[in-house]
């Protein structure tokens, strides 16, 4: 399959082309039914000769080219309708009736706040042109009215509030929110790309529109991405501020799989300047070694790393409800446990040469001993709760009694 992508250097185009090329080059094997031979990437620096050749040769077209923020409103029609005419005329020239996807916008509904949108009018004109092309040629046309888009590589201070918020907060720049209660419908770039790949496999999702509302149905003349999220401007900004504090608090917010928060967090991180991609952690250092907290979570505890100097014993305490897992990743050590009120000592010899996890059982006093005379003992420690100095649940008691 040979695929033509117009607007290939735009936000959607870059992400889609990356996905298509990963499949073409065998780096992405999750869609075995897709065999991609060529990805033709058309943009402003391409020539009409190239467009002509690619329109003759292609098996599928993603038309993402368009104008979002022109200097003059008249450029909307030229950029969003004019190029579409050129594209379709070139396909007709070669009698190439391959499927064509059109990137449109919710604003093409021309309803509500979009009633007087010049951008919306140009997009609606493009839709009508493509649908007319479909009726006259029999070519399959997929018209997608996208809501607000967000994700990596989206240009800030252009036409995405999320991109602007992420960029500005990541770079310590001011943001402006006039009404935090305004709700947006948001489509994540990976979900959009997944739908485009579905379309290549003839698994696109069809619908009609009642105003801005999607009415799903297999006979709908439009198409849509089934996974979107709704959030207010205030909620979006609050989440991004939480993400920005993570290097200080170590707290990873709840980001369930598929959630808006997870997608927004990844988006925010893509705007971090290089100096913020590295940050210091607080090492608690003494003559025995060091203890450093790495990550805190809201409901699943924390992860730390412990370094013990040669011959050092750490621990010698027990917990009621708290429990831990010790994973030695470097060095040679001994982990000991003893159930409170008993004399039997459990001994677990551990080494970075064989990674194992030892559970510090509730009600068992425990320690960890560096058996080496020359090397540090490095241990990753998981605890089921974040340490709370007001409720430490930690009680001193040596494992081995004198």
Feature annotation, model-predicted:
Residues 85-127, 134-137, 142:
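Conserved Rossmann-fold NAD(P)-dependent oxidoreductase catalytic core, especially the SDR/UDP-sugar
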Residues 275-316:
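A short glycine-rich, His/Asp/Glu-containing loop-to-beta-strand
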Residues 198, 202-282:
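Mid/C-terminal beta-alpha module of Rossmann-like enzyme folds, strongest
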Residues 147, 164-187, 199, 207, ...:
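A conserved pocket-lining segment of Rossmann-fold NAD(P)-dependent short-chain dehydrogenase/reductase
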